């Protein structure tokens, strides 16, 4: 069976950490920001981890 190709869109959105966990950016931080609190925008800047149920599919998409 041939190797899986990396999903290039997923590769740009997710990063696999050294521990094996997958990080992602939060949504709702690209436009229409004037009505959002500074506190909310600050929290949206932080990275978060992919949920455990989604991790296997993401890991498969970004497989090297």
UniProtKB/Swiss-Prot annotation:
SUPFAM superfamilies: L35p-like. PROSITE patterns: RIBOSOMAL_L35. Keywords: Ribonucleoprotein, Ribosomal protein. One of its GO terms (cellular component) is cytosolic large ribosomal subunit. The keyword Transmembrane helix does not apply. Residues 10-44 have a biased composition (Basic residues). InterPro entries: Ribosomal_bL35 (IPR001706), Ribosomal_bL35-like (IPR021137), Ribosomal_bL35_CS (IPR018265), Ribosomal_bL35_sf (IPR037229). Residues 1-44 are annotated as: Disordered. GO terms for biological process: translation. Coiled coil: none annotated. GO terms for molecular function: structural constituent of ribosome. The keyword Manganese does not apply. Belongs to the bacterial ribosomal protein bL35 family. PANTHER family: 54S RIBOSOMAL PROTEIN BL35M (PTHR33343), LARGE RIBOSOMAL SUBUNIT PROTEIN BL35M (PTHR33343:SF1). This is Large ribosomal subunit protein bL35. It comes from Halorhodospira halophila (strain DSM 244 / SL1).
């Amino acid at each position: 069976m041939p190797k899986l190709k990396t999903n290039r869109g997923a590769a740009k959105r997710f990063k696999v950490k050294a521990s094996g966990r997958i990080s992602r950016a939060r949504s709702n931080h690209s436009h229409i920001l004037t009505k959002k609190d500074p506190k909310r925008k600050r929290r949206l800047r932080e990275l978060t981890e992919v949920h455990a149920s989604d991790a296997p599919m993401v890991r498969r998409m970004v497989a090297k």
